[in-house]
Amino acid sequence: MSKNQYTKTALKEAIAGKLQRHFGREVADASKEQVYEACALVVRDALTEHMIETQNEVEKYGERQVHYLCMEFLVGRSLRNNAYNLGILPELTEALKDMGYEMADIFEEEADPGLGNGGLGRLAACYMDGMATIGVRGTGYSIRYEHGIFKQKIEDGQQVELPDSWLASGDVWHIPAMDDTREVKIGGTVNTYFNDQGKLIVEYHDYTPVLAVPYDMPISGYDTNNIACLRLWEAKSPIALDMKLFSSGEYLKALEKHAMAETISMVLYPEDNHREGQSLRLKQQYFLVSATLQDICAKHKAKYGTLENFAHKHVLHINDTHPTLVIPELMRILMDENDMSWEQAWNITSQSVAYTNHTVMPEALECWPVSLVQELMPRIMQIIYEINERFCKELWNYFPNDFQKISKLAIVSDNTVRMAHLAIAGSFSINGVSALHSEILKDRVFNDFYKIYSSKFCNVTNGIAHRRWLCEANPELAELIESKIGRGYRKHPSELQVLANYGNDKVLLQRLGEIKRDNKQRLANYIKEHNGIEVNMDSIFDVQVKRLHEYKRQMLNILHIISLYHKLKDNPGMDFVPRTFIFGSKAAPGYAVAKKTIRLINSIANMINNDPDIGDKLKVVFIEDYKVSLAEMIMPAAEVSEQISIAGKEASGTGNMKFMMNGALTIGTMDGANVEICEAVGRENIFIFGMETPEAEALAASGNYEPMLIYQNDPVIKRVLDHMINGFGDGVDYTDIANLLLHGGNGGPADRYMSLKDFSSYAIAQERVSEMYRHAENWNYMSLMNIANSGRFASDRSVAEYAQNIWRVKTNFAF
């Protein structure tokens, strides 16, 4: 069906038909969940038609394809997004209204897919939207996690992790493609030899076969028939149930091999602080890349009869180091299964793989024990050894006789496989994700590699799906924008810049404030319902929602909140601009400090929110189970965006862009994409504080940072930390957190991320925020300038830069 065929009447008939055929229900008897699934099936049918058309065009014209591998894709809910992109959201809304349903209620029936955790997965999802919209022939690849990350519950102030059984209603968007099932070999032993004809023979013994079963999720683009596909692999065991064991009552033993195989696609990011967890993570990574490459290579060979032209037709883009095994796996397929020489296989591989780095944190640059890689994928370890040997010989030409340097840069060293080094050696492109981050990679993290391979390094600043995060999440704001500049920005986000011409339009500025208040009210209602907290609608909604990690410095925010509490306790009648501090984040289950920080936030919230001296001047809210659908409500309501990581640690960030696009003002350090946001809006429209990267790095390197001196000399900080040590009236001891700041712990220095050092600068910036907020028209002007300058952070632009500078494929995007 074409867009014009999706009339209200046609949609009503199609939905009713799905209800009858799939559920045996008439409209009047159907549940909301059944109506949601019927709507999803109708929309999916349209997407599937377009996906087949797209695949046929790729087959016909032989265009170069982009294969985007990532361990997570945080796609969010699909029904509204797909209906919007297809241009049928108004008709679908009216059809449901005629059938007795509110569209918002039907949207709520859709579970958030448990396919991602944080910024990495959300970025990947935004890029799939961008690829589809601007005409890139792209496919994403990941794992179909049964339980995703986890469902977060807050009990007694503490995070509790529960399974997220999202597939119960989420698989309606997944189209099984059983014909493309692949077998992945895990473990066992390998015997290699050359036969009489000089052909390399590789024999596998005693391995565990795991079937990779693909499910395809169509990803729509805006106002286009081009569809990107997200292929998700599910692990299944091909081994038949041992009925003899089962019949004899040994049920668990009979199911053991099934369970071992299917555990691979059970959860995202299993804890890796023990060998079993490390083993499962590495199995997941190899499962993803092996299934994906087998699939791509088989289809390519069926079409062309050879893999010799593979690099001309495919780009394998690895999003962070998790899929780096794509390099030795492609070598394995080319040599072992297609009789290529090492040199020919390496030439193809190193022209096919592009690598995006997402971190400067040493612990996040993955390393695996050689023994574990050898145990789980012996042939891959053989190939890695050979890559390493040849790589080290190449390094020797640049650093002759410098054994220490070569050991530092080697792929395999100290019985460890360094995945980032493997990615650098085997990729034709290495990019960072903000201008600052890319410079840090070149100047510090990978400086020696940059000296050798400078032409490989480039930057592509992250971007967000602006239609989802502005047009869909904030329709009132989109309507206001379109009343002034039209709809062109939907496909050409740079047109948002025209809004800067309306800075003197007092009516527009007033309306901007009204829209923000409407969105605040929506969030306030949610907080009242789910947290039981009545927030002050006249307060500043100050928001920090992101993964919980020490470098992101939720702690700095906490310290400031406690200091404000002390001010109000000392002088309850003071002239104080009310604040509502809103947090949302998940802590990795094994990250004790992060989990204790969540408990600390909730202890402080309990103290402040129940203190009659404070009233509605100050509130603290922790929103449970933060996810995409909640972000779509929080971002439009936020007035202050907390982007306060220590300078030099955040690669880019994308939450900062979403807040900016929805008119929130950023308080932040000169870190990640904050630097480019500051350049875009001007220092007068952002609240910058703290050390910049050179100063922070120099202080850390000097070893002269002494937070105890700050504690002793700054009465505000001393009082805050003493309060933390003495507790917040709920019996929970936070001395361990205070000690981390003052004395260090777990082998790390005191206040590793320098929250105490930046505290006074942060507090001054927050005073500026309060002062500016008193002047509504000026605040709304600053908000408008942020919206007007946010177009450069659209994922359409990011994807177009990848396409032009790295993938070398055509798009319909106009810079």
Protein language model regions, located:
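A conserved ligand/cofactor-binding region detector
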Residues: 1-815
